Amino acid sequence: MGAFENKVAIITGAGDGIGRAEALALAAQGAAVVVNDIAPAAADSVAAEIVAAGGRAVVHCGDVSDWKTTADLVAHALDEFGWLDIVVTNAGIVRRSPIARVTERDLDQQFAVLFKGTFGLIRHAAAYWQGEHEAGHHGHRTIVATSSSAGVPGGVQEFSVYGAMKSGIAALTLGAALEFRSFGVTVNAILPHAATRMDAAAKGLPAPGPFSAGDASPENPFHVANVVSYLASEQASWLSGQVFEVTGTEVRRWLPWSPGASVSNGAGPWTIDALDGAMATSIYGTLPGGRVIPLAG
């Protein structure tokens, strides 16, 4: 018996790349999958792959940036399968641009798809699960959100808007984990590294070919899907509010923002000169010759 027998999963952006791999991986372990994508042909293709392999899948086409679409997505899962256990928020968009050239449209689109789309689906799923819990219908329910190393730790040139949205998703993961523990829902996030058409297009690279589960390439999205499968499983029910970077077969835990060195000026106010000296000697330290240690990265 697979890890997800009698489980129902929603995966957004599942028509290609990481989302496709996640849908196929969960379905291979018995999950009934709602394959969401904005491109109907792509969603149909992945659902057909699942069904051809003996699994269960239905298609939901829609743009997650629309609040009603994310509500309809949860309703569609309930209408088709009767309940919902797993949500994987993978749908994404990226626009490469220096900050000084970002347009309002670029900003609005990335916010709507990346952050609002993630938040909307999490919100609607949580409302359903909270109601189920209050009605006495308990079970293992889980959310896996997709952040990015452009957001955690951040600082990728020309991807600042994308990184800011992805950083917000990591923060949302921590907050949601605290809120949802009262009704038995775990929430974790991943920072995936894999070859995808979206990433290649943003960087001006050729589109990668389709991957299979057995491909050992470190860029294979199925490496990410394997980690998502674990986080969605009951074996990971003790984990919540965590962020994991996935690079090939390497999994790295990322910690939230943590305080560094501090310095106080006692009762007196800071001056520019005093704070400059404190920064060099107490906050960052100095190297021989007085050169300030640069920021990491």
Regions found by a protein language model. Name each.
Residues 122-123, 174:
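A short, exposed helix-loop element centered on a Lys and neighboring polar residues
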Residues 189, 210-297:
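C-terminal helical subdomain
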Residues 2-34:
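Canonical Rossmann dinucleotide-binding motif of NAD(H)/NADP(H)-dependent dehydrogenases/reductases
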Residues 5, 53-56, 76-87, 95, ...:
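A glycine-rich helix->loop->beta "capping" turn
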Residues 40-41, 61-72, 104:
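The beta1-alpha1 cofactor-binding region of Rossmann-like NAD(H)/NADP(H)-dependent oxidoreductases
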Residues 98-99, 106-111:
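Substrate-binding pocket helix/loop in short-chain dehydrogenase/reductase
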Residues 134-168, 173-174, 178-182, 191-217, ...:
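Catalytic loop of short-chain dehydrogenase/reductase
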